[in-house]
Each structure stands twice: as structure tokens, then as C-alpha cells.
């Protein structure tokens, strides 16, 4: 991954410390499934047109990624807005923009580029702080999604806030950002459910390094104690069975943050 120019510019990445001011923006995670053979064309459209038009209409582009093992031809990206009203107004203006319509028409001369879109609205957790500009160097991002048992998201957030972030850093993982689903998911297209979902990003030197870090993390007596105490307080596991999903990502060449 190339050197980051400025994380403050794009406002995405987090540190383990709490933010001096809460980040009240609305975030959106969007996943596009490209038609067979069309992912390169989709990336070209974003590179040449879409990012500029998003900026024109007041949307903040954060990161654009593809999975390391991209068997589904996915593009995963994150945007930020002042609030939901700003988001809806920005998309309405973008979709009506003649420049967008022309770019879409030209790019789809040989067929549609996208077969399916998923979207979820996110809010920053209180332990996901904006960080100073920094370079991550070579490596991979990891997108992790946790689904909790009903009523246990607060317990999960508390465990991350008080223990997990520090232990991740101890074992060589870099905390990037942490989100919960926004309460208002109207218009979203996602299987995720508000009130029981934590979504976050880490960086690692490699997928192998990630495995080694998590193996050491899970064996750490401090983690074992924190996990046991949090589950005792909640009355059971904080996440549902098979409720932790992980996907390694690499940034596209046009991603603002790399």
C-alpha cells in the first residue's frame, strides 16, 4: 500500500484513544457486485468520474477496496456525510447530474457493470477516534463484522473500549475504525441489523501476520479474563453462533486512503 497523504483530510481512521469530540457524521458502507468481466470497467468509472462527482455533490470518499480473494467481483467502499438529510440530498443531486448520466451511459455501452448493490448506514463508536496523518506501509486491511445476541451490543462495545483495542495493538494489529449500524436503516440494502452489529477495520502486514496476531491475542491471559468477565456480566456469549465474519481487503489505486 502506498503512503497515506492525509488521514485527517478524509476523516476515516481511528486510534485506540477516545475522540476529544464525538464524530457525529453518518457513514455508509456500500458493496457493489460487478458483472462478470466488468470489475475493471467499474473501477475505471470510479477512478475517472465517480469520485470527482461524489466530491462535487458534498460526499466525502473514505476508502475503496477489493477483497484479496475476490470470487464475487466485489468493490467495497465507505462514504461520509454530515447527516442523513445531507446524504439523501447528495445522492439525489449526483444521480441527476448530466455528467454522471453521460459517464454511466458510456461505461455501460457493452452492458451493465453492476449486478447487485448492498448498503448499510453506520455511526462511529465512542472509542473510534480520528487520528493524525500516518502511513500504513505495505499490508492488508481486514474488515470484521460482529453480530451480537439481542441486547448485548453495549457489552461488546464496552469490551472493545476497555480491553480489545489495547490488546490488538499489543499483538501487532493496527486499529483503523469502528462503527455500529445507524438506528435508521431506511433505504439500506443489507442483511445486517441495527442494534446488534459492530463493523471495524484493522490493518496487518499480511494475512499470515494477521493469523499470528490473532492466535497470540486469543491465547493472551488478559484477553481470556476480559472475555470471561464480559460474558459473565452479560449472561452468555456476546456474539451469536458464527457471528464473526472477516474479509481481507486491499485498497484500489484510486482510494483516498491506502
How would you name each of these model-derived features?
Residues 19-225, 229-258:
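Short S/T/G/P-rich N-terminal loop/turn motif that feeds into the first structured element of a domain
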Amino acid at each position: 500500500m502506498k503512503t497515506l497523504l492525509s488521514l485527517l483530510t478524509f476523516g476515516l481512521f481511528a486510534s485506540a484513544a477516545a475522540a476529544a469530540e464525538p464524530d457525529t457524521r453518518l457513514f455508509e458502507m456500500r458493496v457493489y457486485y460487478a458483472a462478470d468481466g466488468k470489475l475493471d470497467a467499474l473501477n475505471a468509472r470510479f477512478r475517472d468520474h465517480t469520485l470527482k462527482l461524489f466530491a462535487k455533490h458534498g460526499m466525502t470518499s473514505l476508502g475503496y477496496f477489493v477483497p484479496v480473494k475476490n470470487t464475487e467481483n466485489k468493490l467495497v467502499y465507505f462514504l461520509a456525510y454530515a447527516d442523513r438529510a445531507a446524504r439523501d440530498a447528495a445522492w439525489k443531486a449526483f444521480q441527476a447530474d448530466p455528467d454522471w448520466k453521460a459517464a454511466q451511459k458510456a461505461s455501460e455501452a457493452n452492458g451493465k457493470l453492476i449486478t447487485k448493490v448492498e448498503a448499510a448506514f453506520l455511526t462511529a463508536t465512542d472509542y473510534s477516534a480520528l487520528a493524525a496523518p500516518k502511513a500504513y506501509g505495505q499490508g492488508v486491511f481486514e474488515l470484521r463484522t460482529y453480530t451480537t445476541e439481542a441486547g448485548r451490543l453495549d457489552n461488546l462495545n464496552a469490551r472493545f473500549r476497555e480491553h480489545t483495542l489495547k490488546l490488538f495493538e499489543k499483538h501487532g494489529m493496527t486499529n483503523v475504525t469502528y462503527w455500529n449500524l445507524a438506528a435508521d436503516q431506511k433505504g439500506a440494502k443489507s442483511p445486517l441489523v441495527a442494534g446488534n452489529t459492530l463493523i471495524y477495520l484493522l490493518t496487518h502486514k499480511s494475512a499470515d501476520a494477521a493469523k499470528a496476531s490473532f492466535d497470540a491475542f486469543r491465547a493472551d491471559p488478559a484477553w481470556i479474563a476480559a472475555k470471561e468477565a464480559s460474558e459473565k456480566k452479560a449472561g452468555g456469549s456476546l456474539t451469536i453462533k458464527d457471528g464473526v465474519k472477516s474479509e481481507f481487503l486491499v485498497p484500489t489505486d484510486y482510494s483516498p486512503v491506502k
